Amino acid sequence: MGLQPLEFSDCYLDSPWFRERIRAHEAELERTNKFIKELIKDGKNLIAATKSLSVAQRKFAHSLRDFKFEFIGDAVTDDERCIDASLREFSNFLKNLEEQREIMALSVTETLIKPLEKFRKEQLGAVKEEKKKFDKETEKNYSLIDKHLNLSAKKKDSHLQEADIQVEQNRQHFYELSLEYVCKLQEIQERKKFEFVEPMLSFFQGMFTFYHQGHELAKDFNHYKMELQINIQNTRNRFEGTRSEVEELMNKIRQNPKDHKRASQFTAEGYLYVQEKRPAPFGSSWVKHYCMYRKAAKKFNMIPFEHRSGGKLGDGEVFFLKECTKRHTDSIDRRFCFDIEAADRPGVSLTMQAFSEEERKQWLEALGGKEALSHSFNTAIIPRPEGNAQLDKMGFTIIRKCISAVETRGINDQGLYRVVGVSSKVQRLLSMLMDVKTCNEVDLENSADWEVKTITSALKQYLRSLPEPLMTYELHGDFIVPAKSGSPESRVNAIHFLVHKLPEKNKEMLDILVKHLTNVSNHSKQNLMTVANLGVVFGPTLMRPQEETVAALMDLKFQNIVVEILIENHEKIFRTPPDTTFPEPTCLSASPPNAPPRQSKRQGQRTKRPVAVYNLCLELEDGDNPYPSKEDTPTSSLDSLSSPSPVTTAVPGPPGPDKNHLLADGGSFGDWASTIPGQTRSSMVQWLNPQSPTTTSSNSAVTPLSPGSSPFPFSPPATVADKPPESIRSRKARAVYPCEAEHSSELSFEIGAIFEDVQTSREPGWLEGTLNGKRGLIPQNYVKLL
């Protein structure tokens, strides 16, 4: 389990567990800060002492290998998993370079040291300053509350009112600072994933230029370089999209925190001061407790907690409520007090003090006191305002009309759906389209009055105005689950199954929309809207959560993955019936308990080749972006990759054991491209390297593979000498263990999967076979020949 999300609503409760979560985030940032300092120190050693290059590289590699990114939430995306694994790949590369004993003369000041120092000083340093302010304000706030609550009720009303106003102003200031600090903590946790890895990539690219064998090794790992670059760009895009949503949620809660309280199992909860009586002549003391009450069971929990003493939880008490009585100031020299009698403690009465008169009234209402408010502590979440958009005949007409206009007029427009239209024009167009009298009069395909960006914004706005998202609140969680776990095949199968559980109108509308988005992605070379970019734009629209929380916003990246799967597998999902017996998604980190050990075909090979990397200089300046808007995603991965890369892809060579091994291992760019579902990514990757010698020879990788076509378009034609001596012709095999692919040339499968055309592979311990039209490598001890 990674770091828990910090909810903005918890800033107003300031519970002990909220403080524990804050400390966990702070500890992680401190660990990151120390690691970056050590990394910078190691980088400077490389510059200062070439004679100690070997020692410095080993230390550097060790640091990279041991560091692991923490994440917010209960799962990570494939992009984040690849980014996390990239540090270990870089570590292996450094060890490989150390074996070669090459003399390296490289200045890493501009490519590594400065970006890391900038990140540490500007980002981590800013968090430290925020922490100091937060700690100082915490001390001030609770000290003032203590002092305020000790005021005698006999003082003049004007004096008491002035003190009340001062305390309330101080509390509001504390809440403001707490909100900003929580937002900053979560932002830096997400930001470091890409701002930290990018300088590393630049540093490694510089190293390649100083090694004679760097060019050949880079070709071997070209697929990894491209995939990691896309992973980083996707992560950046998702971060930018999520950040605006988080800031919007924070502003909503800041304006009206009471209306955004999270649903809780407790009727009331919060801090109360409890009077602890002592034997004479010591009097009594007031101790702050965090109290929780369940009205149904009349169960009252209270835990002593002091913010200023390190925030350690004390031993809690639990009792059952008998009755609650309001205390008047003529019977006690404190304000906001009430008494509680416990049913299981006869004769024992506890006197408690709330922070304010309003909070006392709320507690009295929850506890069954005489004075009650019209609202309780944990009010239900206010539902979203629903527009008059519906999935009726008019709704389908509007969507089809917008789609037809977009495909006719602007399918090649750069930033399609990413560039937003003028709000007033969008609202006017929607009003005309949703009016029965004017809908047929609106000509979107030929009229110059409506820009394409206005039409696309109107389409998205209409979908967001539906009473319920297209993929429904009921199935929202079910769609998220396969995006968080399982193999690529099992994800597609699970989402295929869930789509057919949607109401018929929802499924029909989703089919129309996804078919259109597939067409848009097929023109990504012109409009720059890849499948990933479309996922970022339409994820929140098609799968908005029912409750707005930080935890829900952290799942935006998984919503994007679901939309990507829908686009990449549109024909299968909407044109074929689902398999009602598909297996449950398997967690990516889980392995079968009794599966035999797998013999890695890269054993002994991976340590002999470095990670292919690139010189990354991604500066997304607002002035260079022609499409600035709140809803825009950042510059797409295609945009940042469109410049010709100095690293070329692997080209077909003469047959031989080494060459065949390289191709089977995924060194060929064509192999990697052919394993990506759909035509979009294959053509996209070819466009990224327009000067690559494989562009013209990789046409077979552009079109989706048919069951009879070869999945390895770059493999040289096999000769008699190349054929394995014990070839198995036209044999079938059944999987006896589930398997998760570790490489693009391998197959993922579940127990019971049937493989066609199984043959012995050149890789020891591996077979080649076809599953669902895709050919790849299979661990020999995971299957049984039929």
UniProtKB/Swiss-Prot annotation:
GO function terms (MF aspect): GTPase activator activity
Site (Arginine finger): 418
GO biological process, alphabetically ordered: cytoskeleton organization; negative regulation of apoptotic process; regulation of small GTPase mediated signal transduction; signal transduction
Comp. bias regions, Low complexity: 634-651, 689-712
Pfam families: BAR_3, PH, RhoGAP, SH3_9
Boundaries of every PH domain copy: 265-372
Region (Disordered): 576-608, 621-727
Domain (Rho-GAP) ranges: 389-574
Keyword list, A-Z: Cell membrane, Cytoplasm, Endosome, GTPase activation, Membrane, Phosphoprotein, SH3 domain
Residue ranges with Polar residues bias: 676-688
One GO cellular component term noted in the UniProt record for this chain: endosome membrane
Modifications made to the protein after synthesis: Phosphorylated. Phosphorylated in vitro by constitutive active PKN3.
Biased amino acid composition, Basic residues: 599-608
Tissue spec: High levels of expression in heart and skeletal muscle.
Subcellular location: Cytoplasm; Cytoplasm, Perinuclear region; Cell membrane; Endosome membrane
Recorded domain comment: The BAR domain is important to associate RAB8A (or RAB8B) and RAB10 to endosomal membrane to promote tubule extension. The BAR domain is also important to recruit WDR44 to endosomal tubules.
Subunit structure: Interacts with PKN3. Interacts with caspase-activated PAK2 proteolytic fragment PAK-2p34; the interaction does not affect GRAF2/ARHGAP10 GTPase activation activity towards RHOA and CDC42. Interacts via its SH3 domain with PTK2/FAK1. Interacts with PTK2B/PYK2; the interaction negatively regulates GRAF2/ARHGAP10 GTPase-activating activity. Interacts with MICAL1 and WDR44; complex formation might transit from GRAF2/ARHGAP10-MICAL1 to GRAF2/ARHGAP10-WDR44 complexes.
Function: GTPase-activating protein that catalyzes the conversion of active GTP-bound Rho GTPases to their inactive GDP-bound form, thus suppressing various Rho GTPase-mediated cellular processes. Also converts Cdc42 to an inactive GDP-bound state. Essential for PTKB2 regulation of cytoskeletal organization via Rho family GTPases. Inhibits PAK2 proteolytic fragment PAK-2p34 kinase activity and changes its localization from the nucleus to the perinuclear region. Stabilizes PAK-2p34 thereby increasing stimulation of cell death.
Protein's name in the database: Rho GTPase-activating protein 10
Organism (species): Homo sapiens
Gene name linked to the record: ARHGAP10
